[in-house]
Amino acid sequence: MAKTLYEKLFDAHVVYEAENETPLLYIDRHLVHEVTSPQAFDGLRTHGRPVRQPGKTFATMDHNVSTQTKDINACGEMARIQMQELIKNCKEFGVELYDLNHPYQGIVHVMGPEQGVTLPGMTIVCGDSHTATHGAFGALAFGIGTSEVEHVLATQTLKQGRAKTMKIEVQGKAAPGITAKDIVLAIIGKTGSAGGTGHVVEFCGEAIRDLSMEGRMTLCNMAIEMGAKAGLVAPDETTFNYVKGRLHAPKGKDFDDAVAYWKTLQTDEGATFDTVVTLQAEEISPQVTWGTNPGQVISVNDNIPDPASFADPVERASAEKALAYMGLKPGIPLTEVAIDKVFIGSCTNSRIEDLRAAAEIAKGRKVAPGVQALVVPGSGPVKAQAEAEGLDKIFIEAGFEWRLPGCSMCLAMNNDRLNPGERCASTSNRNFEGRQGRGGRTHLVSPAMAAAAAVTGHFADIRNIK
């Protein structure tokens, strides 16, 4: 029987399945950070259990770390306790930890792929909703809760029901300057923020194959923002070339054998999906969210929509509420909306290609008066690579702040946050009320679009800037 990629990955990891029971899956990789793990380790300690597979468990600090100093006291008492607990727990249970002084420290979903921890064909979990990022490699990756973190630590397995399948095909070639972020925002604009609920999404089509691994990670990172359980891109030569030579990737003949298997990780011809969505890449322009969920998104050259234009009463009410919170009026051009802060970073857009794209816009320009702009590399290696290329100097000369790795202003769990009423052009993944700080107003954009907003002081079409 013809199978989708998701069905192949799921079936390959079923350890035990009894009739009328939820299947038990084997977990190949478990990624851990300081926020969702303390209670899980406490549970192991209480029951006298070890970590079953410490060699398949990798930890880093990211969510509430300071991006201005490596001092764990810098972000308050709760952050300090969580980081100290992670240090203690990893030492006690034999888990490898990339702490603040480790050269590989960074956002968990940047670190995993970078170190070859993430490989095609794997099941990967983490106590974080954006674990879907790793699906870019043709891995089944999804976020889990703290009680599930404990279960995986103790057993290296997890009970998971089968999801429905969705194919999202982006046909044709994207125009120059259109990034994975624009593509995924356009997709969510079409499906809505709940369009993928109950599904695992496979992204395919020429525009997807044209993306680098970094672009594919951006795409899969935001699968959760359309309500999906996970996002997938089938592995290909782009994937294999990225993985080859990385720290935890197979070497020599083992790598060749792995690639032979990875090449089978494609949806079979004739396999059926529960839902199919199609977009034309050439119709996608630079995207900017205007509301309080990622599905409330328009082209940079559009006007703020009128809630009255929504036929669905629920959408209409949501739009009215969003505009009130965002302090926007219907009908005004998005390019006239001024911003206060810019955040370039997060597990969505903090990799080297993202920073290069932003630096290309920033080069030779200055951050607009009254705007604070942060650039936060996703990991130690990204920061080092950017500095080797001189990107840090470009940003600093333009008036951006060049920070240490961490989740930073993506979420209000550290010192980087918005004040009430402040408007931010952000390369992160969520624009809910208060996501970047109580009363903060978040607009999601690509790195180049964020840099353009920084130097102009408002939203601007990068195609007109270059």
Swiss-Prot record:
The lineage of its organism: Bacteria, Pseudomonadati, Pseudomonadota, Gammaproteobacteria, Enterobacterales. It is an enzyme of class 4 (lyase). Its cofactor is [4Fe-4S] cluster. [4Fe-4S] cluster binds at residues 347, 407, 410. Heterodimer of LeuC and LeuD. Keywords: 4Fe-4S, Amino-acid biosynthesis, Branched-chain amino acid biosynthesis, Iron, Iron-sulfur, Leucine biosynthesis, Lyase, Metal-binding. Its EC number is 4.2.1.33. This is 3-isopropylmalate dehydratase large subunit. SUPFAM superfamilies: Aconitase iron-sulfur domain. InterPro entries: 3-IsopropMal_deHydase_lsu, Acnase/IPM_dHydase_lsu_aba_1/3, Acoase/IPM_deHydtase_lsu_aba, Aconitase_4Fe-4S_BS, Aconitase_4Fe-4S_dom, IPM_dehydratase_rel_enz, IPMI_cat. It catalyses: (2R,3S)-3-isopropylmalate = (2S)-2-isopropylmalate. Pfam families: Aconitase. GO terms for molecular function: 3-isopropylmalate dehydratase activity; 4 iron, 4 sulfur cluster binding; metal ion binding. Binds 1 [4Fe-4S] cluster per subunit. The keyword Metal-binding applies. One of its GO terms (biological process) is L-leucine biosynthetic process. The keyword Cell cycle does not apply. Pathway: Amino-acid biosynthesis; L-leucine biosynthesis; L-leucine from 3-methyl-2-oxobutanoate: step 2/4. It comes from the Bacteria.
